[in-house]
Amino acid sequence: MSSSLVFQGEFQHIIRIYNTNVDGRRKIQYALTCVKGVGRRFANLVCKKADIDTSKRAGELSKDEVERLTTIMNHPRQYNIPTWFLNRQKDIKDGKYSHCLANQIDVKFREDLERLKKIRAHRGVRHHFGLRVRGQKTKTTGRRGRTVGVAGRR
């Protein structure tokens, strides 16, 4: 087992993965969570599939290991990661299971909201007007605009 205290070789303090700066001083399992769409469990699973020691620091990884991580994160279904683990299941357009990362999440989210607004779904209309979407009360909270003071006694 390799020790994290003594490391021979190049240590990178910042690694670029999916257009995200990953801190090289953190352990790889937690460093991957900097990437949008990667949580602790998904990062742990990806490290296990790539045969990378989870006690390693992110800066200790070689280029080959980083490449393995990114290919597994790109194509999780090819590496026998179950479909319930993915964050985009049964896509409304093509019906495929996929895992969105970094900028893909923002694009897909925006597309979903635009589709809801276009078909005039209740959620889409609430999003359009900037109101609460998930059934919260709006009588007293969530007010915006000018504040109206209480009329004092004359």
From Swiss-Prot:
Gene Ontology annotations for the cellular component aspect, listed alphabetically: cytosol; small ribosomal subunit
Superkingdom of origin: Eukaryota
Keyword DNA damage part of the UniProt annotation: no
InterPro entries: Rbsml_uS13_C (IPR027437), Ribosomal_uS13 (IPR001892), Ribosomal_uS13-like_H2TH (IPR010979), Ribosomal_uS13_CS (IPR018269)
Subcellular location: Cytoplasm
Main localization category: cytoplasm
UniProt GO BP: translation
Keywords assigned by UniProt, alphabetized: Cytoplasm, Ribonucleoprotein, Ribosomal protein, RNA-binding, rRNA-binding
Recorded GO MF terms: rRNA binding; structural constituent of ribosome
One Pfam family matching this protein: Ribosomal_S13
Family: Belongs to the universal ribosomal protein uS13 family.
Cited function: Located at the top of the head of the 40S subunit, it contacts several helices of the 18S rRNA.
Name of the protein this chain belongs to: Small ribosomal subunit protein uS13
